[in-house]
Amino acid sequence: MNLKQKWDVYSRLTRLDRPIGTLLLLWPCLMALVLAAGGMPDIKVLIIFIIGVVIMRACGCIINDYADRDLDSHVERTKSRPLASGEISTKEALLLFVILGLAAFGLVLLLNGLVVKLSVVGIILTIIYPFTKRVTNMPQMFLGVVWSWSIPMAYAAQTGEVPIEAWWLFAANWFWTVAYDTMYAMVDRDDDLKVGIKSTAILFGKYDRQIIGLFQLAALLCFIAAGWSADRGLLYGLGLLTFVGFSTYQQMLIFGRERAPCFKAFLNNNWAGLALFVGLGADYLF
């Protein structure tokens, strides 16, 4: 395997070729940094968190594919993943995971002690998550915790503490993550039932759209509470209204429960997250 082929394999393993997950992690993290700073965050902290999000997203993908390597080959969407297809060995994948994990931890060591402690919890959660799909019908709810963990870390890095405002944002992102990852799980539902992978899409069954809607509403209310706690104004409110618009569009997409529209609904959450971040940023600027 030449260098170009190796890079292609690593890119697919870490999803560098599919940045949607990184972006969905990035928007709430940036929102947390902006809220914690009351505007523009410390540049050093900002750079560390942006790089950290990219690295930890890659780590999460590697450990997820390692855990699912024997199941992914039976699922249409995942059968070509490098570990499932045998393009890379488990030993090499785990080595890459360790290298990237150490790099992320090295970045964290540039910040304060509270962030370091929170980061240890974060990496443990990242490792545990892929295996929850074997034992619970609610892995998306565990993922919501994993994908929201950068929020208290961001507040800790910027202010040295984690106030109530941070937990409102944490709750908002948790509800939102469960909603959009259930859309994602709807894409694989038929295959998951065959191979024994558990998900909220399976758990919610025929009530999936309604329950996703409730989670979207809960996310909105918590985003409102986070903004209220930080005394945010009109432009943040416009960002929230745009979020509502995107959420409504996603409900239309998943109405027929077909694979392609459900995946499109999942991808659309990137724009919902961008709208929230832009609204928040504009509210501080203007």
From Swiss-Prot:
Q: Which GO terms describe its biological process?
A: ubiquinone biosynthetic process
Q: Which reaction does it catalyse?
A: all-trans-octaprenyl diphosphate + 4-hydroxybenzoate = 4-hydroxy-3-(all-trans-octaprenyl)benzoate + diphosphate
Q: Which GO terms describe its molecular function?
A: 4-hydroxybenzoate polyprenyltransferase activity
Biological pathway: Cofactor biosynthesis; ubiquinone biosynthesis
Positions of transmembrane segments: 21-40, 96-116, 142-162, 167-187, 210-230, 235-255, 266-286
> Known EC number(s)?
2.5.1.39
EC main group: transferase
Keywords (alphabetical) are:
Cell inner membrane, Cell membrane, Magnesium, Membrane, Transferase, Transmembrane, Transmembrane helix, Ubiquinone biosynthesis
Cofactor needs: Mg(2+)
Q: What does this protein do?
A: Catalyzes the prenylation of para-hydroxybenzoate (PHB) with an all-trans polyprenyl group. Mediates the second step in the final reaction sequence of ubiquinone-8 (UQ-8) biosynthesis, which is the condensation of the polyisoprenoid side chain with PHB, generating the first membrane-bound Q intermediate 3-octaprenyl-4-hydroxybenzoate.
Q: Which family does it belong to?
A: Belongs to the UbiA prenyltransferase family.
What is the name of this protein?
A: 4-hydroxybenzoate octaprenyltransferase
Q: Which organism is it from?
A: Shewanella sp. (strain ANA-3)
| Gene that produces this protein | ubiA
